[in-house]
């Protein structure tokens, strides 16, 4: 806010300001902001599938009895008919993390890469306020990091975060787009 005037070296009168708020440029760099407080199931699922590199298909039964399953060979995520919205969102979050893992690191081994992917999915679920029912992967933390030095551990944690962030950023863009379309439609009805 203005806090008096002063005369500069060149003789020009200028206004002195008292700074109330300081922002880091990284705080202003984001082109969109989603309203996370009460995301609907539709918004979350729309966000997860937004600009997805793979397709989704409903089936009666998936391989291995899983309710949601990514098939790298078919570039398809299969999901079982009649799932609860919470199970569907949690499963999609996990499987899109498998898709992102494959995108970043190549072939996916569901056994070997499960800890990294499930950890990333857990982070993603927490970011999107998706309830998580299965946290069994947390029991594997000690075994997974055993024998790694601090540099390797840090790199693995960074990789987990990278997977979660990539899926989260795409989902947030999709949710933001959906919210903007809804807000624009609501404004159009008010006119």
Model-derived segments and their meaning:
Residues 1-191:
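N-terminal accessory/interface modules of nucleic-acid-binding and processing proteins
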């Amino acid at each position: 806010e203005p806090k008096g005037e002063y005369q500069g070296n060149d003789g020009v009168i200028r206004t002195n300001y008292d700074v109330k708020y300081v922002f880091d440029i990284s705080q202003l760099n984001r082109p969109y902001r989603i309203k996370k407080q009460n995301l609907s199931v539709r918004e979350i699922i729309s966000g997860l599938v937004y600009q997805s590199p793979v397709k989704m298909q409903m089936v009666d039964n998936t391989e291995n009895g899983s309710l949601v399953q990514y098939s790298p060979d078919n570039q398809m995520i299969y999901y079982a008919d009649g799932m609860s919205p919470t199970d569907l969102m949690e499963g999609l979050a996990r499987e899109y993390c498998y898709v992102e893992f494959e995108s970043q690191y190549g072939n996916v081994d569901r056994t070997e890469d499960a800890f990294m992917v499930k950890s990333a999915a857990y982070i993603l679920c927490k970011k999107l306020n998706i309830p998580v029912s299965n946290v069994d992967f947390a029991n594997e933390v000690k075994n997974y990091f055993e024998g790694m030095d601090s540099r390797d551990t840090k790199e693995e944690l960074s990789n987990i975060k990278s997977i979660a962030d990539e899926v989260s950023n795409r989902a947030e863009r999709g949710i933001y787009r959906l919210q903007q379309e809804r807000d624009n439609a609501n404004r159009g009805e008010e006119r």
